[in-house]
Amino acid sequence: MLGMIKNSLFGSVETWPWQVLSKGDKQDISYEERACEGGKFATVEMTDKPVDEALREAMPKVMKYVGGSNDKGIGMGMTVPISFAVFPSDGGSLQKKLKVWFRIPNEFQSNPPVPSDDSIKIEERESITVYSLQFGGYAKEADYVARAAQLRTALEGIATCRSDVYFCTGYDPPMKPYGRRNEVWLVKA
């Protein structure tokens, strides 16, 4: 676990492969259109809890799996970003449900270790095209909701995105105080 934190703060981590298809800027909102590769992901689903609370419970499970709590007892190293799917309600607030997605590192894509925790599932995910808006700070549910609304407004008349789900992402460990990177991803319809 300390190795993962050290690498996240001072070293390099594997980035989820994507290709920037285009960049845009509208209403002071700069965004990218990206084609994100699919692959195998470790997932944890949480329900009946607000997003921030659900994340505090789900993230340690994923970190333990990545750190070696698996059938092979090996630490895999981090990939970024860690993303979580959120599900909007009418009016823009979020349902009490989320799904954390951690992309298995390339070295383990063909044969990922089996999680020791039964609540973690290994799932194959297709590639997706997203519109991404980056922002800093310690992101909370309200920040993601606000940024998603800004991005939707900026994309009006330009792109059609799914309204039933979007992704919130983080690139940094919780103890990194400055230069934090978060993104909201709207999925192209």
Curated annotation (Swiss-Prot):
GO CC entries: cytoplasm
InterPro entries: Reg_factor_effector_dom_sf (IPR011256), SOUL_haem-bd (IPR006917)
Comment field on protein domains: Forms a distorted beta-barrel structure, with two helices that are packed against the outer surface of the barrel. Porphyrins are expected to bind to a hydrophobic patch on the outer surface of the beta-barrel structure.
Cystine residue pairs: none
Subunit structure: Monomer.
Main location: cytoplasm
The keyword Cytoplasm belongs to this UniProt entry's keyword annotation: yes
Its biological purpose: May bind free porphyrinogens that may be present in the cell and thus facilitate removal of these potentially toxic compound. Binds with a high affinity to one molecule of heme or porphyrins. It binds metalloporphyrins, free porphyrins and N-methylprotoporphyrin with similar affinities.
Pfam families in the cross-refs: SOUL (PF04832)
Family per record: Belongs to the HEBP family.
Keyword field: Cytoplasm
Subcellular compartments: Cytoplasm
GO molecular function, one term: heme binding
UniProt protein name: Heme-binding protein 1
Superkingdom field: Eukaryota
